[in-house]
Regions:
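Phosphate/pyrophosphate-binding catalytic cores of soluble transferases and nucleic-acid-acting enzymes
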Residues: 1-320
Length: 320
């Protein structure tokens, strides 16, 4: 039997502090990082995505960061395809891939090698649902989803029309709930020898970090970044512009919301998103939870992660 290849996953809600830990980990074991963030993949969208800066990378190779134009669609199928290609390159160099990011759906698809091609989307039904969303609003589709699959509705925001439509399509096509399908996929055996870490803070601390992060984004020029994208012709119907910290500003630029209200909305939406992320990770199996408050220093946290990786036989210790 072929030996399973090593894979490390470092995830957690937005603003948990994954970036710093991921760099320390990569430098310790000779790892290379693949981003599992559905937004950091886009060019020109740096502030609102809290994209890692080149100087923060500290020489560690990164994949799926700053690779797509905002006009392009990035989805789970493209992610898995690109991530697997990057992993082959990393393995060939004798290094270990580290998946870092908060898009749990992408991580699950890669970790358990889920094939999405078996459920071909029905073009006509999708267009029908898209039309419904235009005529009656996103909330209308979301209410249908809540009736059909309330469990899945808990972890997807009504603004994420693409995922709402996918769940409705899946139900129409198979007669089953997408939440049940996801549970079945989680029971699959992963083709990798993996360690799955979820870094988190207690809720009050996390929410405070989110609020402060949004304030810092505004100081760093988030408003100007969004304005520049709109002036370049990027419209609100694009997948990229539906991201947190971007979609909220369209109402502001249309004169329907004050700047203060917009910033509050970004904070609120981000807090809700973090809550949904944690709900997703709780449903995953073989997860190691890392509560930041239990570690006095970053080094203690890194040492704990390295010990677990060693115990799992993923690597023998530090390489750098």
């Amino acid at each position: 039997m072929e030996q399973k290849k090593p894979l490390i996953i470092l995830t957690g809600p937005t603003a948990a502090g994954k970036t710093k830990l991921s760099i320390g980990l990569a430098k310790s074991i000779g790892g290379e990082i693949i981003s599992a963030d559905s937004m950091q993949v886009y060019k020109k969208m740096d502030i609102g995505t809290a994209k890692i800066r080149p100087e923060e990378m500290d020489g560690v190779p990164h994949y799926l960061v700053d690779e797509f134009d905002p006009s392009e669609e990035f989805n789970v199928v493209v992610f898995v395809e690109r991530a697997k290609a990057a992993m082959e390159k990393i393995y060939a160099a004798g290094h270990i891939p580290i998946i870092v990011g908060g898009t749990g759906f992408y991580i699950q698809a890669l970790l358990y090698d889920i094939d999405f091609s078996e459920h071909e989307e029905k073009e006509s039904y999708r267009k029908e649902l898209e039309q419904l969303a235009k005529e009656k609003g996103k909330e209308y589709l979301y209410e249908i989803l809540k009736e059909i699959d309330p469990e899945y509705a808990q972890i997807v925001h009504f603004n994420n029309v693409k995922r709402v439509i996918r769940a409705l399509e899946y139900h129409k096509e198979t007669g089953h709930k997408l939440s049940e399908h996801n549970k079945e996929q989680r029971q699959k055996d992963s083709p990798y020898n993996f360690a799955y870490f979820v870094l988190y803070h207690d809720r009050e601390v996390l929410y405070d970090r989110i609020n402060r992060r949004v304030d810092l984004m505004m100081e760093d020029g988030l408003l100007e970044e969004v304005k520049g994208l709109i002036e370049e012709g990027y419209t609100k119907d694009l997948v990229s512009m539906q991201g947190l910290g971007y979609k909220e500003f369209f109402d502001y630029f249309d004169g329907e919301m004050s700047l203060e209200e917009t910033v509050d909305k970004v904070k609120r939406d981000t807090r809700r998103f973090a809550k949904r992320q944690l709900t997703w990770f709780r449903r995953e199996k073989e997860v190691v939870w890392l509560n930041k408050k239990e570690y006095e220093q970053e080094k203690n946290l890194l040492d704990s992660v390295l010990n677990i990786i060693k115990e799992k036989g993923i690597c023998n210790g530090t390489k750098r």
